[in-house]
């Protein structure tokens, strides 16, 4: 299949509509019947605020996260419409890819 690999970058403690962004995105992805999502937790990062974000022994809410998915063009359009209509502000990257299963 042809489509996109989308990566959303955020930090663990950030919320949107009273939910953690990761959970909000996963809920929307399920509603749109997108087949899967992978969440990666990173040790350290910094973004547009130029602050270092990292996981700490006592505090994990500042830990950087990436939410990754592979979607068709139609799914991509629907997902970004949901994001726009809810006014979620989140960094993303989107690349054209071929994806599927080996057998």
Segments (PLM) and residue ranges:
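Positively charged, small/polar-rich N-terminal and surface patches that mediate targeting and assembly
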Residues: 1-103
